[in-house]
C-alpha cells in the first residue's frame, strides 16, 4: 500500500503514519513545507473523496490554515493532530510533558542518564513507556517495542540507531522548538571550545546563568536573522534546564551550540 492509500483509512496505524510522513517529507529535513505541504493537502483531499469520507473537523481546520499559505511549515506533531492515528501512538504527540522547550530539556536530562549526548533504543523505550503510564495506558511489551522502532526510524535523521537532542526535539510542536533557531548558529568544535572558555569567566569548568546570559546576548546580536533577543529569557530558561543544579557543563551546552563534525 502507498502513502496515498493510507490516507483513505478510517484509522491509521503507527507504521502507516511513518510511511505517510516519510513519503511527504521528501527532502528528509524533518518538516513538511512548500511544495511538500501543498502536495500533502491536495492528496489528502483526493484520498478522502475517493474513500467516500468527509474531511474531519481537524482536517478542515488544517486545510484552512495551510491550504493557501506559501510559507507554511509543519512537523510530525502537527501531522499527528490531523490524521486519524491509532490512539496509543497518538498520545506521544499530545504529551503535556513536552509542551515547551524547557519541559523537553528536563525530560532529555532524565532519559539521557549516562550524559552520552544521545538516547539509545532502550532509553527511548523507557521514555515512551513512562509517557503511556502517565496517560494511564498499559500496552504489551511487543507493541511498545514496535512503537520504539518506528519512532527511531522516524526521528533518526542520520541513521546511527540513536537519537540526538535535536532529533528527539521533533516531538515538540514547530512553534515551541527553539532548537530549530539554533541550527543556523552552531559552531565547529574549535570555535565552541573557545567561546565556552571565554564565557566561563571564572574558569571553573561550567557556565552559570549570568555567564549564559552574556553568551546568548552576544549570539543574538551576531545572528539577528536566526535569533530574536526578545526571546532571550525563553532560550536561557530552556538551556538552563539541561544544567546540573545551575551548572551548565561543556557537554550539555555543546548539544545546543556545537555542530557535529564528521
From Swiss-Prot:
One Pfam family it belongs to: EF-hand_1
Classification via InterPro entries: Calbindin_Ca-bind, Calbindin_six-EFh_dom, EF-hand-dom_pair, EF_Hand_1_Ca_BS, EF_hand_dom
Note on domains (UniProt): This protein has four functional calcium-binding sites; potential sites II and VI have lost affinity for calcium.
Gene Ontology biological process terms from the UniProt entry: calcium ion transport; intracellular calcium ion homeostasis; sensory perception of pain
CDD domains: EFh_HEF_CB
Binding site residues for Ca(2+) 3: 156, 158, 160, 162, 167
A GO term for molecular function: vitamin D binding
Tissue-wise expression: Highly abundant in supporting cells. Also present in hair cells.
Gene symbol of the encoding locus: CALB1
GO cellular component, one term: nucleus
Residues annotated for Ca(2+) 4 binding in this entry: 200, 202, 204, 206, 211
List of residues binding Ca(2+) 2: 112, 114, 116, 123
Name the record gives this protein: Calbindin
Main function: Buffers cytosolic calcium. May stimulate a membrane Ca(2+)-ATPase and a 3',5'-cyclic nucleotide phosphodiesterase.
Family per similarity comment: Belongs to the calbindin family.
Amino acid at each position: 500500500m502507498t502513502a496515498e492509500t493510507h490516507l483513505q483509512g478510517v484509522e491509521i496505524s503507527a507504521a502507516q503514519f511513518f510511511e505517510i510522513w516519510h513519503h511527504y517529507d521528501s527532502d528528509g529535513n524533518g518538516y513538511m513545507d512548500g511544495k511538500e505541504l501543498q502536495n500533502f493537502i491536495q492528496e489528502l483531499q483526493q484520498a478522502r473523496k475517493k474513500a467516500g469520507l468527509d474531511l474531519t473537523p481537524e482536517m478542515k481546520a488544517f486545510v484552512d490554515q495551510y491550504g493557501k499559505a506559501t510559507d507554511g511549515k509543519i512537523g510530525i506533531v502537527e501531522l499527528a493532530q490531523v490524521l486519524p492515528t491509532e490512539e496509543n501512538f497518538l498520545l506521544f504527540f499530545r504529551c503535556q510533558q513536552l509542551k515547551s522547550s524547557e519541559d523537553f530539556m528536563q525530560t532529555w536530562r532524565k532519559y539521557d542518564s549516562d550524559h552520552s549526548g544521545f538516547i539509545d533504543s532502550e532509553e527511548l523505550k523507557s521514555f515512551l513507556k513512562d509517557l503511556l503510564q502517565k496517560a494511564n495506558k498499559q500496552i504489551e511489551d511487543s507493541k511498545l517495542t514496535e512503537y520504539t522502532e518506528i519512532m527511531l526510524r522516524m526521528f533518526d535523521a542520520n541513521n546511527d540507531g540513536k537519537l540526538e537532542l535535536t532529533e528527539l526535539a521533533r516531538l515538540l510542536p514547530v512553534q515551541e522548538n527553539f532548537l530549530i533557531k539554533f541550527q543556523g548558529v552552531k559552531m565547529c568544535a574549535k570555535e565552541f571550545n573557545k567561546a565556552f572558555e571565554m564565557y566561563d569567566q571564572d574558569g571553573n569548568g561550567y557556565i552559570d546563568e549570568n555567564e549564559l546570559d552574556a553568551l546568548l546576548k552576544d549570539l543574538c546580536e551576531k545572528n539577528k536573522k536566526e535569533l530574536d533577543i526578545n526571546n532571550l529569557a525563553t532560550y536561557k530558561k530552556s538551556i538552563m534546564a539541561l544544567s546540573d543544579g545551575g551548572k551548565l557543563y561543556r557537554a550539555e551546552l555543546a548539544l545546543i551550540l556545537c555542530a557535529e563534525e564528521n
